[in-house]
């Protein structure tokens, strides 16, 4: 479809969506005041978006429009994948509408798909324009719904290609140093592959908005990699060098957006024994090559990231033991942000799987509330906890994407209430109680 025709179609669809929204829900949440940087009219306006403020870091806090900005967000890694085909695109729209109805403001999602089904990058430096337009649509639609995006740029895991696909490409072209997946981090040819991808993505001109990604404030931050690990070098030096090189490269192209590494938060060789003791369980080796404090101190990294999965990491623990661990884990990392790092800390993934023996929906309510309480308490003190993003939310009819952690909000009323409550609490820190009720309307009524 030609760009011009695509723009016309998108304007029509945007207008139709707005009319339907008004017709069916007069009390719909209005995030225009909560996120004044994002337009709500049908169709994304280049002129309007280009003049909008970016989320920025000041010391250990995030700011937007001169006020501290705290994130109640979610993960939906699949947005680009479902935006490719016309018959699945409505699920993307549905997810954004549902999120906004709960006051959620930030979504973390994949901006990569390497060499697999619906691949964005077909081979090094060669991209599928059809899939790139799907990512354009995700960014434009996020803007229309008043949602910011954290876009992850690669995967340590094999899903959606991952670092293994880059290694396979180098091996097939006869330039790879080794077949080890960890060569992604030290092989010069593979590092060059990744830089080509980074430059192409950052300078991509959205066919719907006319903005290059590096100029679009809808994007809150870039994430170098989802859960980077380099087990072949437990010293952490290989992974550290890669993070330093790639973060500097991103910033050489895009100085407007925030940047994070994407780490899970494991303490490494440069950490004290006290910190190492916080790592989850004796079975969890300190040889992943990750080093939370060292990695997060990198000059070009704006905020630190933490993940927490107590049922995966403490498989035989009771609910109380998982709760104690999770509380200690998040609190320790927020304290790092307050102290040694002097940077914001975001819990970019947290979850509890329904596939664990003895699981009850109420267990999620208990553990997720604990995460939200830590973030809210830190926000009230002006601390380093910048927010938390649940893993993961899904739209109805997406069983094929369920991974044990997926939550369809309409099927979990108590979870919807909990998420809404957190949205209101963080809005109250930013705007005051009365301001929060005005900004989020029916969510905080």
Swiss-Prot record:
Report where it is expressed, by tissue. Expressed in stems and seeds, and at lower levels in roots and leaves.
Q: Does the keyword Glycoprotein apply?
A: yes
One Gene Ontology MF term: mannan endo-1,4-beta-mannosidase activity
Binding-site positions, substrate: 110, 226, 309, 391
Signal peptide (residue range): 1-27
- Record-level GO BP terms: polysaccharide catabolic process
**GO cellular component terms, A-Z:** extracellular region
- Family assignment from sequence similarity: Belongs to the glycosyl hydrolase 5 (cellulase A) family.
Its name, as the record gives it, is: Mannan endo-1,4-beta-mannosidase 2
Q: Which organism is it from?
A: Oryza sativa subsp. japonica (Rice)
Q: Which gene encodes it?
A: MAN2
